[in-house]
């Protein structure tokens, strides 16, 4: 084992190693999240976490990283870009017959990749310390990763509650490495949102109820990924063709003009998930679903909820007799799916009877214009 390094030198080496491992930025902070505890408790008290009971169950543990790994003194916070080339944001959103999947989920599940890189970083640090305990986290334990990233200088919290970076926007994953050595800490950066409320006004379902506060129960990401039961009827028409997650609050953000493309091949879109036809997706058997989503974040919602989400999107599409036939073909498979199919069929018939050729969603039309003008590379 080599001689222990000066902590300032070690911190610089850690940041360099992080870049070599594929992270775009590395910051260091202490474990004090006491300022976040009242906000977290107020959010939970308002039931904004919906059916994510584990969030309430873990309570304030999320704001106390030192309790996850006793002896923890510092948190090394990292970010990794995930935006793929040819993201096709606007072209997918404005085509109702296509299914929109949040761009972070088009490739391989990020959890394992980031965790392995963080583990390697911990092992590299270990080689330069007499002793070191470390533990990597990637959205996998009760930890407030965004406040930690903010304290570590990776960016500031936007009004949509995501971390924003002046040079990279918000299309990146976060990860943490807890360590028990007193490394020098980084300073937070100045926030850059000012009076802008674009993310709040563009949200299809009005889920950003006040600056920095998201009511998950209205968020399309929650509805399509976390919610296990029926999607509230009043929110279904607002979901459009989004079948797994939603990127609207990021796409409207001016800072994402500076978003950087990923350098990771694992985050490249899988062909069956990139601008897919809704009718084709709705025809997938469970076997096909499991095969296509192997190693993907999408797999965890299961085939039933996948079909539930697509049924809603088909219900939101313009009248098409092939859609009606597709919906009819899956009746009787499960009560949850049947309920959403019945709703979708009713929507289709209503449009047929009213001769509605196109469903107008002003927010979506505005978003598409903004993307095509401000993010031409990714439109």
For each of these PLM feature ranges, what is it?
Residues 188-198, 208-211, 299:
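Flavin-dependent oxidoreductase catalytic cores
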Residues 163-188, 216-235, 286-290:
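Short, charged low-complexity linear segments at domain edges
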Residues 307-318, 339-348:
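Structural detector for internal amphipathic alpha-helices that build alpha-solenoid repeat scaffolds
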Residues 289-292, 319-331, 351-361:
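Amphipathic alpha-helical scaffolding segments comprising HEAT/armadillo-like alpha-solenoid repeats
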Residues 260, 300-305, 334-339:
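Alpha-helix N-cap/helix-start positions at coil->helix boundaries
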Residues 23, 198-222, 228, 242-266:
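Iron-sulfur cluster-binding cysteine motifs and their immediate structural context
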Residues 1-192, 240, 357-379:
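Auxiliary alpha/beta "docking" domains used to position bulky ligands
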Residues 270-304, 311:
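Alpha-helical adaptor scaffolds
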């Amino acid at each position: 084992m080599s001689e222990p390094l000066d902590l300032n030198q070690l911190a610089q080496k850690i940041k360099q190693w992080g870049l070599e491992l594929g992270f775009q930025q590395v910051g260091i902070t202490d474990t004090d999240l006491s300022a976040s505890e009242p906000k977290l408790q107020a959010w939970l008290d308002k039931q904004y976490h919906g059916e994510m009971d584990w969030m309430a169950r873990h309570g304030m543990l999320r704001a106390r990283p030192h309790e996850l790994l006793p002896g923890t003194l510092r948190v090394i916070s990292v970010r990794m870009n995930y935006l793929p080339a040819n993201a096709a944001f606007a072209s997918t959103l404005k085509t109702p017959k296509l299914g929109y999947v949040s761009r972070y989920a088009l490739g391989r599940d990020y959890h394992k990749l980031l965790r392995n890189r963080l583990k390697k970083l911990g092992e590299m640090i270990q080689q330069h310390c007499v002793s070191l305990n470390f533990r990597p986290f990637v959205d996998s334990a009760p930890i407030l990763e965004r406040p930690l990233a903010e304290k570590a200088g990776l960016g500031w919290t936007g009004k949509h509650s995501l971390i924003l970076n002046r040079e990279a926007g918000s299309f990146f994953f976060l990860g943490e490495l807890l360590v028990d050595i007193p490394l020098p800490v980084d300073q937070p950066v100045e926030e850059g949102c000012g009076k802008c409320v674009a993310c709040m006004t563009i949200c299809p379902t009005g889920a950003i109820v006040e600056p920095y506060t998201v009511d998950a129960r209205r968020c399309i990401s929650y509805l399509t990924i976390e919610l296990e039961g029926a999607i509230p009827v009043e929110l279904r028409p607002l979901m459009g063709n989004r079948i797994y997650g939603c990127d609207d609050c990021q796409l409207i953000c001016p800072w994402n003009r500076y978003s950087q493309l990923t350098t990771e091949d694992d985050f490249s879109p899988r062909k069956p998930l990139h601008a897919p036809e809704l009718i084709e997706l709705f025809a997938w058997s469970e076997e096909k679903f499991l095969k296509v989503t192997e190693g993907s974040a999408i797999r965890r919602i299961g085939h039933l909820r996948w079909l539930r989400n697509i049924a809603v999107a088909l219900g939101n599409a313009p009248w098409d007799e092939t859609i009606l036939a597709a919906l009819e073909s899956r009746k009787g498979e499960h009560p949850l799916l049947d309920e959403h199919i019945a709703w979708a069929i009713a929507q289709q018939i209503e449009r047929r009877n009213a001769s509605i050729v196109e469903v107008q969603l002003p927010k979506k039309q505005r978003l598409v214009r903004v993307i095509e003008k401000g993010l031409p590379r990714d439109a």
